[in-house]
């Protein structure tokens, strides 16, 4: 009944597409524009997310944060109120960067892989977390001194009781101590294995105290998180900023070089700038042509051709110098911009990371200890524990190899100056100017400046 009461469109009434009045044309055009905009947005989203793997893990959603203050200290309101807008801006970017790292990498690790882990790998990961929870050692050592006093008092009581025993027991004790020491040398503890393999090859518990382990793990882990932020946020932002400054100078150099090439091609096509072979033939027939052509105009033409040949040799050199200067400016500006951004970040966020973020992160990890997500997160965070120090001697050997390779390259080049066929290509070194141009063009394409 309700449908029957609605007014029906007359059969001869024109539709929106058929009507040619201004109102209908305007409505039709706006409708088509909306459809095109919607299709364009869908295509853009497909290009942006089509090849990206869907994340199956979210740190804030899939971890147990009960009895922790992690969600509080990472909230925007808390950060703005305690640290202000400027500092909280850097802190929020850091937290998002770490969450993104964890979410992406944990999503790549399957439960089957976690279940197949060697138990000793899990013991190592848990030991790293326990070591990190000591916060560098000072608080631990404050509690440790009282325990050492009690242990010393108990050891004195035991020594008084044991003093009544015979010489045989004393000899057996000394022998047992020697066996324990030799056993430790043959079979290092788990802590010794971790430190020797990842941080310090010469580490032993007899020469380094626990404070060294706690401080090394704490400093390495914090520095690892900061350096990850440097690589993923500061460096790309600094490169984009520098490329934005150098984009116009680069395009100006390229356009000048293209114009120069076009002029050279036109001059050769018009016959004004003959090739070297043609110019030699012209010189051979000079005596015959001088009698026919005007000598003055011929001299002017030859002078202009010489100037053009000279320009053909000098202009590329000038452009090459400009490209070298552009590359040097890129290197200098990038380094300065990265240092400035890193200093700003450290001044704004280092205190928060050390005093609030890391302790809260440790609490969250302990709250989820034993679950598959816990082992996945620890596998992702493990490289940060060994960020600063490498196993001794690797860097020195690499530097020696670089120096030797550079010396070999110079000797090979000096040997093959005259013989072009014998040039050794395996020592090819990319031109930094080309690398700079590629980097600027890559950033320009990504930012849609081109």
From Swiss-Prot:
Q: Which domain of life is it from?
A: Eukaryota
Q: List all Polar residues biased stretches.
A: 152-171
Enumerate composition-biased segments (Basic and acidic residues): 141-151, 283-298
Q: Name the Gene Ontology biological process terms.
A: branched-chain amino acid metabolic process; response to xenobiotic stimulus
Q: Which portions of the chain have biased composition (kind: Acidic residues)?
A: 395-411
Q: GO cellular-component terms in the record?
A: cytoplasm; cytosol
The UniProt annotation puts the region (Disordered) at 141-171, 276-298, 395-416
Q: What else is known?
A: Present with 98 molecules/cell in log phase SD medium.
Q: What is this protein called?
A: Uncharacterized protein YKL075C
